[in-house]
Structures are given as C-alpha cells and as structure tokens.
Amino acid sequence: NGYRIDYARTINGVPVTQTIANGGALEDMDSTMETWSYESLCFYVDKDGIESMTYSNPYTIGKIKTENLNLLSFSEVMKIYEKMMVVTNADNMQYENSRVYNIDRIVLGYARIYEPSTDAHTGILIPVWDFFGSMTSESEYNGETESNTIKTPNESFLTINAVDGSIIDRNLGY
C-alpha cells in the first residue's frame, strides 16, 4: 500500500493539466500512424519511501510561437461546452436511456497537441479548458434498468481550446 504522486510541467506559472488520458491513441485499429503519448512524471511512495519512479515521453520546450494570446471569454467557453457536450455524446444515446454529467471542476491549463500524420514528435502547448466531475448513465438490459456512475477525479469529459473554441480529444492528443 502506498501513494502515487503525479507531477505536471508548469510554464510561466500555468500547469499542463493532468488527465487520465495518456494521449497517443489511434483513431481506429487499422491506423498506421505513429503516435505520441503525453509527458508523464510519476512517483510511487510507500511507508519506506520512494518505491519507484517513471518519466515517460519527456518534452523538450522550444520557443514561444505566440505571446499574449486572446482567450475566449468564460461565457463563450460555457456556450461551447453546452453545445458540444450534446454533440460529442449524441451517439451514446443509441445504447443508453439517459446520461447526466455533474461537472464540479473547470480548469484552465495547457494541453499538448500534435499532428501525427505530419510529425509525431513535435507538438505545441495550448491553453485549454477542461471539465471534470462525474457521469451517470442508465440503460436497459434484459428488461431491467441499470445505472452506472463514473467518478474519476482526473477524467476530463470535455477539453476546449481556450483560443479558438475547438474540441481537443485528450485520448488522441489533438
């Protein structure tokens, strides 16, 4: 028994938001693209001290491409959230009777994005809004209603680019 401690890179006082997603997933199983998972620094600590440490996919920070970006207002971000939560979950309603999100934490931080079809080793850190909380779904199976609640503290249910409002898929990394 012990603890897992995750560390996040901070740039000018703003952290890269840690989520449960590792990034670098494939769009489909037939994809031949090379992928790139997120940077991860993790310590496992038990009663005797540090048991182990992993540092994966370290970033090399280059030059700042654009300074003093204009971010979307929070009200603009919330309008995008309200619309895109419906859009991104539309296909789930084929299998579920209902799905309810309880967002209890909204975080402004950085996320790394990249274009695996162009360059799987170079990305940029962009400001994003992440929406965390819980999700409860109900579905029917053999005539009985089943309810399932997911509450993972670092699972982002939606990531919105804070500059242009586009949606970032945390699993894919873009």
Question: How would you label these PLM feature ranges?
Answer:
Residues N1-Y174:
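Long, terminal "pre-/pro-" and other extracytoplasmic accessory regions
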